[in-house]
Amino acid sequence: MKTIICGAGDVGYSIADKLSRENFEVTVIDEDENRLNKVSENLDVKTINGIPSMPSVLENAGANDCEILIAVTKSDETNMVTCQIGHSLFKIKKKIARIRQQDYLKNDWKNLYNDENFPIDAIISPEQEVAKGIFRRLISPGTIDMVELSDKKLKLIGLKCEDNFLHSGLSVRELSEKFPDYLANIMFIFRGDQKFTVNSSTKIEKKDTIFLVVETDNLTDVLSEFGHQELQAKKAVIIGGGNIGFSLAQLIENSETYIKTELIEANKERAEFLASNLENITVTCGDGLDNQILEEVNISDSGYCISITEDDEVNILSSLLAKRAGANTSITLINNSNYSSLLSNIGVDMTIDPKIITISKILEKVRGVKIRNDYSIGEGFGEVIEADIQSESFLCNKNLKELELPKGIRIGSIVRDKKIIIPNSQTVFKENDDVVFFAETNLSLIHI
C-alpha cells in the first residue's frame, strides 16, 4: 500500500519504520536533509527533500497513486494544506493530519473538516490524546496505565508487583490455575532494565511491572491479588496550564468521578484565561518549582501531582519536589525519551511521552477497519493491538499450537459473540473474533 509521510521528525520516522516493516511502500518528505539522511540510512523507504505542501513535491513522491497521506510536520497549517492538495489534485483516499493548535479543534469549527472544506479523514491532537491518557490513570487507582478494550469488556492494565504481592515465584500458568475464575492474562513484563514477552512458564517476581488484559468485572479482584487496594484519589494538583493541562482539567471537571483539582500556571495571562474557563478547578498563578506555591495548594494532601509543562526539566524537578513534600503519586510529561529510563530510579512514578501516544493513534487510523485499538508500549518495545480476525488472516481456523507464533507475540484475549475467552494452545481462532495481542516492535504484523 503506497503511503506518503510528510515530516521526518521522531513521529514521522517511527511511523515510517513501523509501516515499512509491514510491507507498506513508504515515501517520506521533509525539508531537512539531515533528517532525511537518518531515514534513508536506517529504513527501507524512499525520501524526497522538499516542502510537503507543494504539488510538485507530492507528485514527485508518487501522490498520483498514493492511498494514504500522513501529515506530521511541525506546522499545523502545512499539515492541513498538504491534505487539501492531496485530496484536490491527487484524489488520495485517506488523509491523516496531526493538529496541535486547539483553536482549530473547537466544536464551533467541527464542520471545517470535510470534503467541501479541509478534507482530512482523521485528525490527531497529541495534546488531547495525552490528556485522555493521564485521565485514564487518575480514575484507575493501583495501575500505572489503563486502556479500555473490546467495547469496555476488557482492560489493558499495567501494575507493579509491590512487596505485599503474595504470589511471587509463581509462573503465569500457575497463577491462571490458582485463580481460574479470573478472566485475565499476563502479556509482558518490565523487570529492571529488561523488557520481555511472557510465556506460560515465566515466573512473576516482586518489583516486576506487568501488563495484562483483564475482564472489567474482575479488575478490582485482580488488583487486590497483586497487592493493590488503593482508593480513588480525592485530590490532584496539575502543574502547567498549557493545552494539555487545560484539556485534562476539562476532562476532570466533566467527569462523574469527583477529584478536587488545583492547577498551577506560571503565566499570569494564561492563568486568568484558565480561571475564567474552568468552573470547579482552582487556578493558582505561580511557579511549580516554588515550595511556597506547593504549600499553598496543599501538595502534601494530593493523591497525584501531574507535571505537564512544556519543559521536561521543570516537569521532572516539580515532580520530585511534590513527592518530597508528600504527594502520593507523580505523573510526569517527558518529550525527551532519553530521560524516561532514568526517572523511575529517582522517584518519578509514571511518565507520559506524547510521541508514543501520537504514533499509536496514527497507526490505529492507518491500519484500517480491522484494527480497533493500537497502543505503543515502553519506548518502542512493542504494541498492544486489538483487531478483528479477517477470513484471509493466517490465524483464522487455526489454534495456537498449529500457528507456532514468533517468540515476541503473545495473544491476550478473544471476544467471540460477546463472550471473553482467555486462549490456550487448543483455542481455534474464528473469522470476526475480536483479538487482543502484543507484538514486539521488530515483528511484522502484515498477516495478523
Regions found by a protein language model. Give the residues of each.
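Cytosolic regulatory regions of ion transport systems
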Residues: M1-I446
